[in-house]
């Protein structure tokens, strides 16, 4: 198991990528939106490099990527809940052909659950399910990798359980 923690696209976006990775705008010039886009592009580049390295050198079987929260580059983040854009996170799962052969039920469950609602509070159970992590805290009903995943839009909450996902219009 390899775990990478990326600082990703947190503010100050201009400091989240090397200047030679500037695609939009001019290197070193503050512009929240363009700097945010460049930070996202850089994160994608780092993920691509990690994926290629692990696939060619480490016999990569499965990979999970997710962000801790979404962001709106047009305003500063506050501790108060502002809007649902912060709840929308990028996430992907890669599985090798060998992994799919050996764990077909998990693959099929992820496919059938791909349009279901999910919050990053459930990442622990998803990781346990995908990576065979044994724990007495693991609940397969809370893992997208199992066919008995139980949550719907109406069930889930965010912001320490105070905001219902179903309130997102």
What is each stretch, according to the model?
Residues 1-169:
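Catalytic domains that recognize anionic headgroups
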């Amino acid at each position: 198991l390899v775990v990478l923690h990326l600082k990703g696209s947190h503010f100050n976006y201009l400091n989240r990528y090397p200047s030679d990775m500037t695609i939009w705008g001019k290197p070193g010039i503050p512009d929240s939106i363009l700097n945010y886009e460049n930070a996202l592009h850089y994160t994608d580049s780092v993920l691509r490099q990690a994926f290629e390295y692990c696939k060619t050198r480490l016999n990569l079987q499965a990979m999970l990527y997710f962000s801790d929260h979404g962001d709106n580059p047009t305003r500063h983040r506050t501790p108060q809940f502002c809007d649902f854009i912060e709840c929308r996170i990028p996430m992907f799962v890669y599985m090798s052909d060998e992994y799919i052969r050996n764990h077909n039920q998990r693959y099929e469950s992820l496919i059938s659950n791909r349009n279901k609602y999910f919050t990053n509070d459930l990442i622990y159970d998803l990781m346990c399910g995908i990576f065979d992590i044994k724990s007495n805290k693991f609940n397969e009903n809370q893992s997208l990798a199992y066919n008995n995943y139980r949550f719907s839009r109406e069930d889930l909450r965010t912001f320490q359980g105070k905001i219902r996902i179903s309130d997102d219009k």
